Design a protein with these regions (language model features):
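Histidine/acidic-residue-rich, glycine-tolerant segments that coordinate divalent metal ions
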Residues: 1-106, 113-118
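Metal-dependent amide/peptide-bond hydrolase catalytic core
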Residues: 84-283
Length: 283
């Protein structure tokens, strides 16, 4: 709600921090970027450069008609039933999602009605539609929209779908990962500790940056619990804080050593998926 208000007032255009940084030119004079996440990788593993899903945000309003739920429910149009049907319609689409596309749809009902003895006429839903590529995001999103509209149509309700720019999938850049791996070994990690690449079906705004410049986004262990939950906690401060900082600092040294030869080679071989201008037009 806070970011929505900022957008309404014109302070921001996108909800993602790095999307705003791209728009405002923060990366215009940046050749490459790196960051890391910590998560429960199991036995303190390091994922050198996991790919991720992108997503499209979605706010949905089902509009029905109020009536007394006890004495005359037949005079109303139940917007909650429309929402429930819509969710089940998406479930019926799941067999059409290819495994390689890693599609995810996980809605929540943020408003299910107003009072228990009135047929719900205003029901709100929020969700992300996630997938592995831009094309599969667009395809899954079209199927989800169709399913949502069918739920409303089935009970005679109306529907309003507001789509919000989400994040793009993270792209791997092998040349940068090779530099990182050398430094992971230098700080004492072994082959048993390092997982090449990685597969993550969550989403990061860093994925947007990876479409424009070479990026590196390793994931380190040192935590327990699922991301964004109450159970998430730092389990090993050395591994969660110091190891990533050391590995990435050493990677910067290697990239800039010898008049930045390594960095220049990476840039020469890099072909951006989008220019900044193309990215902003797409968003």
């Amino acid at each position: 709600a806070y970011r929505s208000q900022l957008k309404k007032e014109g302070h921001i255009k996108y909800f993602g921090g790095k999307q705003e940084l791209i728009r405002k030119g923060a990366f215009d004079d940046v050749d490459m970027a790196m960051m890391f996440h910590v998560l429960d990788t199991g036995d303190k593993k390091v994922l050198t450069g996991p790919v991720s899903n992108g997503f499209i945000g979605k706010e949905v309003k089902f509009i029905g008609k109020e009536a007394h739920a006890g004495s005359a429910p037949y005079e109303g149009i139940n917007a909650l039933n429309a929402a429930m049907l819509a969710i089940n319609n998406v479930h019926a689409q799941r067999e059409t999602f290819k495994e390689a596309d890693r599609v995810r749809f996980h809605p929540i009902i943020t408003k299910g009605g107003d009072i228990v003895n009135v047929v719900p006429a205003d029901v709100r839903m929020e969700s992300y539609v996630r997938a592995r590529t831009i094309d599969s995001m667009i395809d899954a999103n079209a199927k989800v929209n169709r399913a949502l509209m069918a739920g409303a149509m089935a009970v005679g309700a109306n529907i309003e779908i507001t789509e919000l720019p989400g994040y793009l999938p993270i792209l791997r850049h092998d040349d940068m990962e090779k530099v990182l791996r050398k430094n992971l070994e230098y700080i004492g990690l072994t082959d048993n500790d390092i997982i090449e690449g990685g597969d993550f079906t969550g989403s990061f705004d860093f994925g947007d940056v990876s479409h424009i410049i070479p990026t590196l986004h390793p994931m380190f262990g040192g935590v327990k619990g699922a991301l964004h939950t109450r159970d998430y906690k730092i389990d090993d401060e050395e591994y969660a804080y110091l190891a990533p900082a050391k590995a990435m600092a050493l990677t910067v040294v290697d990239l800039l050593f010898n008049e930045a030869k390594e960095a220049k080679d990476i840039l020469q071989n890099f072909k951006p998926v989008m220019t900044k201008e193309e990215y902003l037009a797409f968003m």
